[in-house]
Amino acid sequence: MTLYSKKDIVQQARNLAKMISETEEVDFFKRAEAQINENDKVSTIVNQIKALQKQAVNLKHYEKHEALKQVEAKIDALQEELEEIPVIQEFRDSQMEVNDLLQLVAHTISNQVTNEIITSTGGDLLKGETGSKVKHSNNSCSL
């Protein structure tokens, strides 16, 4: 059995990160983000939302509840308008695709590490038990 250092593992993680950054999903994400940054309508709405959010913070601080409700309603309306823009929808979809890929990689690594531990200790993969667990459960009486 080869023993790896944390440094070795981190280097492999960097290699994997580079591979992930060169996938179709990440490429689409980059293009969608660029389209958003170049879209004047998106920029205008985002700036309006930011300005209203600052107002909302001030109104909340000074306990201007009715005015705060009005500003929050304007923010909600602008956010809905933003979400209806096709490039925003494409960007959100691409974010989800990249996130799904990252989750898949994380789960795969976790599951594989668990499986390697089980098999390297002579355990039972089907039961998800390590070798020591299998060994000790065979020697004990059942209730």
From Swiss-Prot:
SUPFAM superfamilies for this protein: YheA/YmcA-like
Q: What does this protein do?
A: May work together with YlbF to regulate community development.
The record ties this protein, via InterPro entries, to: Bact_com_dev_regulator, Biofilm_formation_YmcA, Com_YlbF, YheA/YmcA-like_dom_sf
Q: Pfam families recorded for this chain? A: Com_YlbF (PF06133)
Record's protein name? Uncharacterized protein YmcA
